[in-house]
Regions:
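Donor-nucleotide binding loops and adjacent catalytic segments primarily
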Residues: 39-49, 156, 163-243, 276-280, ...
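An amphipathic, basic-hydrophobic alpha-helix
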Residues: 66-95
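An aromatic- and histidine-rich active-site surface loop
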Residues: 39-43, 95-114
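Acidic donor-binding loop of glycosyltransferase active sites
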Residues: 93-95, 238-253, 260-261
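Structural loop-to-beta junction motif characteristic of Rossmann-like glycosyltransferase folds
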Residues: 116-117, 241-242, 259-267
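Active-site-proximal region of nucleotide-activated glycan assembly enzymes
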Residues: 2, 29-32, 51-53, 112-161
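Conserved nucleotide-sugar phosphate-binding/catalytic loop shared by glycosyltransferases and other
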Residues: 3-8, 25-75, 209
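Short amphipathic alpha-helix
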Residues: 13-24
Length: 286
């Protein structure tokens, strides 16, 4: 059996794709990945040899676009959907699993046009526009935040590296796969005080602020473990005793799996303020 996994753009979506791939392999199901040339899809999966095949299409988002550009993007998505239908035929795809994000649109629509089962996983407490649009047509809609709760897919390695923390020696600052300027500034401002207390810093700063943060730590003569992006985030978490983090859903549940105490600072401009509601969901479970 061969299925198509589609979606991405950011690490939150792509982490789910990776979990689904690992689960499918255990069940002897082959997977074709359909993502985008834009976003982080290629950084995550261009060299992933476990996919039967990978396709990175010219799909793009429509957020903050003019009406004309949105119509143009829709027509382009329909064209890419036709390409996806050809992929389905060539690889004998029997079902499509979408994790949302703009890169999921072509294959998701193609699944409907091809009368293939469409499964959707929504990561956040507030559904994205594409997932909301396709939800009525999906064979199954999965969410950890709805009344019919579905377990959130988290890679085994986050559980495997879990431990009980008894003292504060290392703090990890997590701004998400794209980095967060506010958390970067917070980390840099706290760095001298943390050094005085002999607390080491692990800092995911994102690509855009990497050089700036690196130079700042060097000017302070602080040996911080600074990185922009990592496919082995569980190793960074394992070494930390406290996290200060954005509240994207994948990061949130990975931190829970790792049993890492966390102070969440939700990104206030996220669509539908979903990071706030992600974090509030955890608070409400207490």
């Amino acid at each position: 059996m061969t299925i198509a996994l589609t979606g991405g753009g950011t690490g939150g979506h792509l982490a789910i794709v990776r979990c689904l791939l690992e689960s499918a392999i255990k069940k002897n199901i082959e997977c074709v990945y359909i993502g985008s040339q834009n976003g982080q899809d290629k950084a995550w999966f261009e060299n992933e040899v476990r996919f039967k095949e990978k396709f990175f299409l010219s799909s793009k988002g429509v957020v903050n676009q003019s009406k004309f550009d949105k119509i143009s993007s829709l027509l382009h998505t329909l064209k890419l959907s036709k390409d996806c239908r050809e992929i389905f035929k060539k690889y004998h795809i029997q079902a499509v699993f979408s994790v949302g994000g703009y890169s999921a649109a072509p294959a998701s629509f193609a699944a409907l046009f091809s009368h293939l089962p469409l499964f959707i996983h929504e990561q956040n407490s507030k559904s994205g526009s594409l997932n909301m649009l396709l939800k009525p047509f999906a064979t199954k809609f999965f969410s950890a935040f709805e009344k019919e709760i579905s377990p959130y897919p988290v890679a085994d390695k986050f559980f495997d590296n879990a431990r009980i923390r008894k003292e504060l020696k290392n703090i990890i600052f997590l701004g998400g796969s794209q980095g967060a300027s506010f958390i970067n500034e917070l980390a840099l401002n706290l760095a001298p005080k943390l050094q005085e207390q002999n607390i080491k810093i692990i800092h995911q700063c994102g690509k855009n602020d990497f050089e700036k943060c690196k130079k700042h730590y060097q000017s302070l003569n602080i040996q911080a473990d600074i990185f922009d992006f990592s496919l082995n985030l569980e190793e960074k978490m394992k070494n930390a005793d406290l996290a200060i983090s954005r509240a994207g859903a994948s990061t949130l549940f990975e931190l829970c799996a790792n049993t890492l105490p966390t102070i969440f600072i939700p990104y206030p401009y996220a669509a539908k303020n979903h990071q706030y509601f992600n974090a509030k969901f955890l608070q409400d479970q207490a």
